[in-house]
Swiss-Prot record:
Source species: Somniosus microcephalus
Domain Globin: 2-135
PROSITE patterns: GLOBIN
A single Gene Ontology CC term: blood microparticle
Quaternary structure note: Hb 2 is a heterotetramer of two alpha and two beta-2 chains.
UniProt protein name: Hemoglobin subunit beta-2
Gene: HBB2
Similarity comment: Belongs to the globin family.
Tagged with keyword Heme: yes
InterPro entries, alphabetized: Globin (IPR000971), Globin-like_sf (IPR009050), Globin/Proto (IPR012292), Hemoglobin_oxygen_transport (IPR050056)
Length: 135
């Protein structure tokens, strides 16, 4: 994936202006409401963003996003350790959609079409890297 300097700067805007844990936890809460079948893998979760199990999982998602952010030019090799997990890769896409909604809600007017496009590209790279390990 080729990143322009502008795209990287826009991804940095998202990364620097958000509370990662809160955004991801809220996105997970939204995921479980909008796509209830995704709770199949999280039977002990009550599905609310403030739930300790959701917060713990949000921390894992934040760690993966941080890893991708820190290696934005070459994400896939850094996601090898996710191979062998048995999760439907489509759930990653659904979570990415929920993250976009939550970021729009969090950043309001700052979530411009350009910023949205750059973040969407980033999340697609992450989803693709994660999905490779689950096939």
């Amino acid at each position: 994936v080729h990143w322009t300097a502008e795209e990287k700067a826009l991804v940095n805007v998202v990364w620097s202006k958000t509370d990662h844990q809160a955004v991801v936890a809220n996105a997970l809460g939204r995921l479980f409401v909008v796509y209830p079948w995704t709770k199949t893998y999280f039977t002990k979760f009550n599905g609310k963003a403030g739930d300790s199990a959701v917060q713990t999982h949000a921390g894992k998602v934040v760690s993966a996003l941080t890893l991708a952010y820190n290696h934005i030019d070459d994400v896939k090799p850094h996601f090898k350790h996710y191979e062998g997990f048995h999760v439907d890769p489509e759930n990653f896409r659904l979570l990415a959609n929920c993250l976009n909604v939550e970021l729009g809600h969090t950043l309001h007017k700052e979530f411009t079409p350009e910023l949205h496009a750059a973040w969407n590209k980033f999340s697609n790279v992450v989803v693709d890297a994660l999905s490779k390990g689950y096939h």
